[in-house]
Amino acid sequence: MIRLAGRLAALIGALMLPAAAAAVAPAAHQIRVRIEPDTRFLEGRDSIRFDAPRAATLVLSARFRVDSLVVDTRRIEVPDKPADGFQRITLPAARRIDLGWSGTLAPLDQNLDHRHTLSYAEPASGKQGTFLPSGSGWYPAVDESLERYSLELDLPADQRGLVPGRLVEERLAHGRYRARFEFRQPAEGIALMAGPYRIEERRVRTAAGSEVRLRTYFHPEIAGLASGYLDSIAGYLDLYERWIGAYPFSEFSVVSSPTPTGFGMPTLTYLGIDVLRLPFIRATSLGHEVLHNWWGNGVYPDYARGNWSEGLTTFMADYAYRERESPEAAAAARLAWLRDYAAMPPGDDAPLVRFTSRTHGASQIVGYNKSAMLFFMLRDRIGEAAFDRGLRAFWNAQRFRIASWDDLRRAFEHASGQDLAGFFEQWLDRTGVPELRIADAHAVATGAGWRLSVTLAQGAPAYVLSVPLAVRTAGGEITRRVELSRERGTAVIALPAEPLEVALDPELRLLRRLAAAEAPPILRDAMLAEHPRLITPTADAAVEAAARDLAASLLERAPAERKPASMQLVVGLHADIDAWLAREAMASRPATLAATRGSAQVWTARAGDGHILVLVSVRDAQSLAALSAPLPHYGRESYLVFEGARMIERGTWPVKSWGQVLH
């Protein structure tokens, strides 16, 4: 699986493979490719072989010219190519196809921000780096087919490059760097990376007894980070081999990109230079990418029936690290998932079974967070031991196969002895999440203690739920699970001491819509807003221009003036913001964000009519311009303080920690 923080939406049609493709023997490519980054020239030859004669359609970018095409022993004339997009070359049944092609790659755009990188699908090259995404048509891919390959790469002597797979040999001679790679497992495509890299290598013996080659391909300015990254990779391999099973490949590399990318693919991850510099990446995102070599690159999602791999990887990586940190950190992670979901406009929601890739914030909330919460609830239901048995059984049965949510369900059913059809159906096939509330709660004294009656209510059609209820009594806190399968149900709980308060799911163990008191406004509310509005209460033209740039960077939808605003982004100098708040009779600047602290303060608030406000108060236009790049990365925060582009303080507004008081 080739992932760009998921997959490129523009390439889904080209890369999505039906399950039937698994039944057809993969095409075998023998590719030789030469790249000249100075001129962005690419020249390649590919010999494609099939186990038996078959018709095939080749997909190649229209930016390339087909120099030669031979099908078995017959030379074929190629139809005129389109001006842009892809050439689709349909060929008769054959065992072998030989094709030569050449052309000019797109220029490397180092000005792309993270969001635009998600939708950039061109094969690009330059002195600082070359990246040819698997679905960009840089080589003649066989449509609707898995592929095996051998690839020989030819680059100038000051460049190094790689593709996913096993490094067979590399050499430096006659002013050229040459390397040969093999990928013998069925793959969904081939991506190629190159750059002025310095390579560091380490060989490790894994828990399963295999020798794995670990490498970093880093630009010179971050070469000093290599040793720490190699240490971390080795640790993650050990963790996941013990949890799931043997690492399925012979190597793993971390490769730096001059643009803010976030790709994961078999045997490697491709991350932006600035991302790799971040101190927390080794403890978070790196493990996520290593784990994808089991889920996504070792077992392939059946995209036609939903991508389960991002949620499972998020649960076993990002969330698992928080769980190992502390119960409080794990609960904070679950709160962040549910708070993100609460920020998503209802029209952006979709059933989890339809998720294929991350293309925007809403798809990440569904495909990563909602999916990870499903696995958390599943583990709660069947127990950790059965959950882990199910994971290992799924891995052993589906290794290098295309697998669906149904295959996962069957593995967990066998491991737990439970029928999980209803559980998976309601969380996969339905749009939305339960909206739960305590409709009534009262207690009466009995001879043996107290009897608490709690009536729970949810919307229609009802979910089948096991709802945690926490009761604070005069003698301490007691937790019970209450089964709810209708729109309304009453549970009676016997207690040894007088109940004082009752709370619905205070530990956030259910996927549900948070109540308003549980979901303080966060920056994500602005980023995903359906009808955002930009307000600039300033006479400074430079501030107005920087505010428009910030809105373009931060918001997923362009600000509009004609529709009623669901969110207002108010941007100005410190004095302008204070005056606007007073004029609109809004609450003044929070005490925690004094105007003298930092060059910029950002905070969220809720207006009297319920819509969200995001206020950005800055020292000057330069301080505002500095926010465009970093601010979109802090969607889960309620307030932030910046000094230039550096975040110096952040936090979320407090939430109500308990539930209904009993009288």
Where are these regions (language model features)?
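Zinc-dependent metallopeptidase catalytic helix centered on the HExxH motif
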Residues: T269-A332, L391
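Hydrophobic helix-coil surface modules that form long, contiguous segments used
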Residues: P140-G287, E310, F315-D318
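Solvent-exposed alpha-helical segments and adjacent loops
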Residues: P520-H663
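Amphipathic alpha-helical substructures
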Residues: Q364-V454
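Glycine/proline-rich low-complexity spacer/linker segments in large multi-domain proteins
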Residues: W101-Y149, R509-E530
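A surface-exposed beta-strand-loop module
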Residues: S61-L118, H174-G175, L484-E498
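Beta-strand-rich binding/interaction modules
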Residues: V66-D72, L420-A421, P434-D505
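Acidic/His/Gly-enriched intrinsically disordered linker/tail segments
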Residues: R184, F280, E310-M377, R381-I382, ...
